[in-house]
Amino acid sequence: MSQGWRGGWSGGRGGNPYAGGWRGRPWRGRGQGGSWSRNSGRDPVCFSTAPPKPQLTQTTLDKYIPYKGWKLYFSEAYSDSSPFLEKVRAFEKFFTKQIELYDKDEIERKGSILVDYKDLLQDEDLSASIPMSSELKEMPEKILECMGLAIHQVLTKDLERHAAELQEQEGLRTEEAPIVNVPFIHARVFNYDPLTPLKNLRASLYGKYVALRGTVVRVSNIKPLCVKMAFSCNMCGDIQSFPFPDGKYAVPTKCPVPECRGRSFTANRSSPLTVTVDWQTIKVQELMSDDQREAGRIPRTVECELIQDLVDSCVPGDMVTVTGIVKVSNTRDGGFKNKNNKCMFLLYIEANSVSNSKGHKIKSTDDSESHGASMDFSLKDLYAIQEIQAQENLFQLIVNSLCPTIYGHELVKAGLSLALFGGCQKYADDKNRIPIRGDPHILVVGDPGLGKSQMLQAVCNVAPRGVYVCGNTTTTSGLTVTLSRDSATGDFGLEAGALILGDQGICGIDEFDKMGNQHQALLEAMEQQSISLAKAGIVCSLPARTSIIAAANPVGGHYNKGKTVSENLKMGSALLSRFDLVFILLDTPNEDHDHLLSEHVMAMRAGAKEMQSADLTCPTTQNSNTSVLEEPSERPLGERLKLRPGEHFDPIPHQLLRKYVGYARQYVHPTLSPDAAQVLQDFYLELRKQNQGIDSTPITTRQLESLIRLTEARARLELREKATKDDAEEVVQIMKYSLLGTFSDEFGKLDFHRSQHGSGMSNRSKAKKFISALNRIAEQTYNNLFEFQQLRQIAKELQIQLLGKFNHSDKMATEIPNLRAAPGNQLRPKGSVSVLITTWDCA
């Protein structure tokens, strides 16, 4: 070992509450003119006061106790017949074999050692001496104390041996054993199984060792907790250190000096014998899996207490596994009277270890960045994932397995499937760069009754971590973060909202158009992937790396293609521009489609397990155009995703699909190939070229980043590390389908002057609609002059109500934009059509 190892163990660890001069270092006391005394029955770290009591001195005890840290862990005196001695020796043998695997400096600095429960079970010598599974569960405090004493003894022997070697090298005397100072070591057992559901956390588990997994929804402030306090006797002045079990204040009942009969004591909070530790509480909410879902019940929560090195191990929204001892606390701090509630207690967990899925406390063996909620995969799961990956047309299988109850909408399901897998976040750990989000956001807008909510619920169900909320019953605090006051302490604590609970997962928001003013709370979360809070003196930022999947109904009940998406939803452009894909679902009557849809609904109602597929001819209202959005291809993606007529389709169960998605998000991190990057760049440049008008939709780098994210998700869907040219071309087709729905007008033509994300069309949509109709008729009839009767008839057909009397072209040009006055009392639109107004007299 190096010289620095010795220095790290030299006495006087000021930061550790259990470190001190228990190796016989005297203190100058206040009373009796001597050293400080100790209570041999209660106090593990105290000192001798007077020569008449040599049997109570630390040095005398240590000479005859082979375990020098015995009094740090056990209140009873050492005895060779102690029932715990055999267990300590077994653990000492175990740690002696494992000590080279641990960082000794880290153990001293933190005051704790992490022990894998699986290693304890696999050790044959330990299993022969101690039935670990039963004894750790039934008597956890004693087993943990034995483990702590064992590692304390191993480290002490190691340090003494090293110190003796250094003394020999320096030529010093070696008659006396070197004095070393090892602090109190907590043994923290992790990977404990089985996990206990919160619904089984009952009074029968009091005092037992349990492990539970959940989401952190509330974190309190860190406070000092006094575990030992020095009390001075008012009669003789003797000082003793009195322990506070579970942090409950108590006063000594008698003085440890035999000659003194004092019964009154004064607390000495500034004494070195007063020990305080960091203390924090968290509230953990259960994870709702498919087999545990219970209707009409709020999720269960449990309070957990963290001390010392466990504090600050998690933030609201983290998924944690807490192992600890079940304790009870009295409800006297509540709002009820003590006399009526003296027997009311609440269960809480005294945490022994906290495993954070983000790797804050216990790091995984994989050094790669953890994406998504960490999941455990059995060998059976891995074989099933391998079987799914080997399917011939995997994209079609996953798209049709997402929501089999909804017929059609293959490209919409394809976009939702890509959002499930998500892209790769860039520069997440680089402090010198701003992170680039990898989670795509998708908005589905359409007429009622087309299955938007069912597809949204299916996505949240398949996601390894999904949160589903409804917009009309959601508040801003419920979406982001809430400051709540603790009734017991009066301090403010953070409670996580839906976006933080969906961190590294999916947050589905239904009825997106009915949220009101809550839209502004989503702006930061959708782009910066975080939630900032500045309230009640607390300024913090919490992670919200979630994909937002929103479903909305247009204003008025039906989608009006004469308006833009912003006008149909009455939503700002800043929010809409953050969505990677915007799908428009229209309920257009079509005989073939309606027939196949009705057959599908009847088959679902009949309970058919395997449904026969039918060829769905999706109606389209778009006409041919020379735009880049409608380049012909050999076989469009929508046709390839459809099932062939008469084909028997067996969808992947959602429970297995959730495992597949979790595996892909956790272990697959694809990158773009040069060919794929070239395809995306060409498509983006073509979009920029076609959208250079004054009133056109701004095509920015957000669209290019969306293409990159979706292409990475397409490669991750097939567990590939490299995104190919075919992946990019399929994503381009999905993007074209999204843009076609948002750019096409009520006549089926592509109008790139429509502002998809803006609201500039709202005050002149009728005028633009009127001028567009005049341009279309002029092109068909090759006549650019219109009489009053024709204009009146066109306005009537378009259901446009013209207010006021227009007797002059200048006035009409002022009232209706895109018209400019021309000589001869005629009006000329922006296009090549001249409109001659002879008489205009309408109310």
Swiss-Prot record:
Q: Which residues does the annotation say bind ATP?
A: 446-453
List residues of the MCM domain.
394-601
What is one GO biological process annotated to this record? DNA damage response
Keyword Cytoplasm included in the entry's annotation: no
Entry GO terms, CC: MCM8-MCM9 complex; nucleus
GO function terms (MF aspect): ATP binding; ATP hydrolysis activity; DNA binding; helicase activity
Give residue spans, biased composition: Gly residues: 1-23
A Pfam cross-reference name = MCM
Keyword DNA-binding attached:
yes
The entry describes its oligomerization and partners as: Component of the MCM8-MCM9 complex, which forms a hexamer composed of mcm8 and mcm9.
The job of this chain, per UniProt, is described as: Component of the MCM8-MCM9 complex, a complex involved in homologous recombination repair following DNA interstrand cross-links and plays a key role during gametogenesis. The MCM8-MCM9 complex probably acts as a hexameric helicase required to process aberrant forks into homologous recombination substrates and to orchestrate homologous recombination with resection, fork stabilization and fork restart. In eggs, required for elongation during DNA replication by facilitating the recruitment of rpa2/rpa34 and stimulating the processivity of DNA polymerases at replication foci.
Recorded protein name is DNA helicase MCM8
- Per the UniProt entry, what species is this protein from, by scientific name? Xenopus tropicalis
This protein's gene is called mcm8
